[in-house]
Amino acid sequence: MMYRIIFLFVFGCFVAHANLNLTPAQEEYIAQKVWQNEGAGLDKYLIHWNDGEDFASLGIGHFIWFPAGHIERFREVFPMVLAYMKERNTPMPHWLTPQTPFPWNTKEEFMRAKEGNSQTYRELFAFIKQTTPLQASFLAQRLDGALPQILETIEDEQKKELIAERFNNILYNKDGSINEHGLYVLIDYVNFKGEGTLESERYNNQGWGLLQVLENIDPNEQDRFKAFSDSAKAMLSRRIANSPIQRGEERWREGWNKRLDTYLLK
């Protein structure tokens, strides 16, 4: 009973006051880890349009950005990044706002602009390149809001407590300090596959975001990072099995699993 009271007190403090304000060193650490996962750390992938997708991916987090009029099941994150930067008075190209759609309507148009090094492409690339610390800071802010967002979708109080406990077990050391590896794991997965709260991010009514990973963690696995990685692999395997065959998601399994292996402590 005493443990439960202590946990609820600490849980409440963590949820309300996480305030993941990263130091410059932590921003650099997160930026490099996430960017290595998303684009192998190579500048040529800072603005990219993957084969088989109808949208572009930008920055260290490969934040999704839609062309004008495009509707997609996945969360459009790049406008959220721009809004975060605008709040901090970050200089941007004059044509760029959080409401601006991706400047090119098709991958062919984008590739012509990239290969031709058009002015719009140059300005966008320079902006992305110069703001990587802010992008890392945005990733931390997004994680900061992830647990409250997840808990709002859960009605059962015991389940809320379980999910919060598992989240905090990854993020914090026993003394309440932030575990930097756990910080990376959570930031990377939320950026990679989302919070798991968006109803459109489902196949056959089954999601694959952070919520679903936390729900399916094996409580008997003593290594917290292995437990998270194993659950994430299971959720993404389920996603592949449920995905429309025309999307060909099996081709991503190996790369996804390699990414999830970086969550293990070597």
Region annotations inferred by a language model:
Residues 1-2:
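N-terminal secretory signal peptides that target proteins for export/translocation
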Residues 5-14:
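Sec-dependent N-terminal signal peptides
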